[in-house]
Amino acid sequence: MKDIRNCKVNFCGREYRNAKKSRGNGKMSHNHQKKIAVINDMSGFGRCSLTVSLPIISYLGVQCCPVPTSILSNHMALGDYFFDDYTDRMEAYIGKWKKLGLKFEGIVSGFLGSKEQIEMVIGFMKEFCSGRTKVIIDPVMGDNGRIYSTYTEEMCEEMGRLIEYGDIITPNLTECCRLTGTAYRGGGWEEAELHGMAEKLSMWGPEKIVITGIPQGEFIANYVLEKGKGTKMIQVHKAGTERSGTGDVFSSIIAADAVNGVDFCRSVKKASDFVRQGILVSEELQIPSTDGVCFEEILYTLERK
């Protein structure tokens, strides 16, 4: 038989190169391809949560395996919506994955609707984490200085417990202030203050932290801390208005890049630039801010490695 391992194959106008070595040593397995489990809600319309993560993570060459926490007809910012809580069904859903013996290179948690769901996520991590698994936690709790009405004081405390399991966490400025007990303000942050908050978060366990959405005059900044590598402020020019789902776009890129071994600062810069460009395209197309970021229009521009 002809050796095709190094052959180039043309498919739908694209060129692919087969892997030089067989990953499975001749045995079929669910676990030969990189996979990320994404625990989040599913909104049918509005470009957020799982409907954002599925295409972006897949485009970056990693299989995206959703764990829905709830099903919504559309993003809650649109007002009237259908909502179906999946808390009571999550355990049975996850149980089937246990039977399949699935292994994950990445686990991502996003918006969680109750203390019970936070407990389930912790249980999921304990069950499926291995030495090769990267855990990315987006501690979705609020924005613009306000904690979401669904988040009780008890849930905020539980979120603090959840991030202890993270390798990477991506809180926005509001969430960072809540987690560290820091008074929120809309601007004028000194780098030393951001460093102090990032250090507090790192003491809980995460190796890599990015505090997102920090207003800095005409810029939006993301403050990065990596244990053993120091800190960095990554800025992009402000663009358009705030939009739903930008955090989900950002964390999806960070997660796929982490599994693919991309440098963290490089990944943060890539994600920041992509979100900004998506906002500009959305403004150009006159898409309402509640509809999220039109990332589909520019997905092909996203660097895969």
Segments and roles (model prediction):
Residues K2, N6, N18-K21, K27:
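Polybasic, lysine-rich low-complexity intrinsically disordered segments
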Residues S29-I137, M141-S149, F295-E297, T301-L302:
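Conserved N-terminal subdomain of the carbohydrate kinase-like
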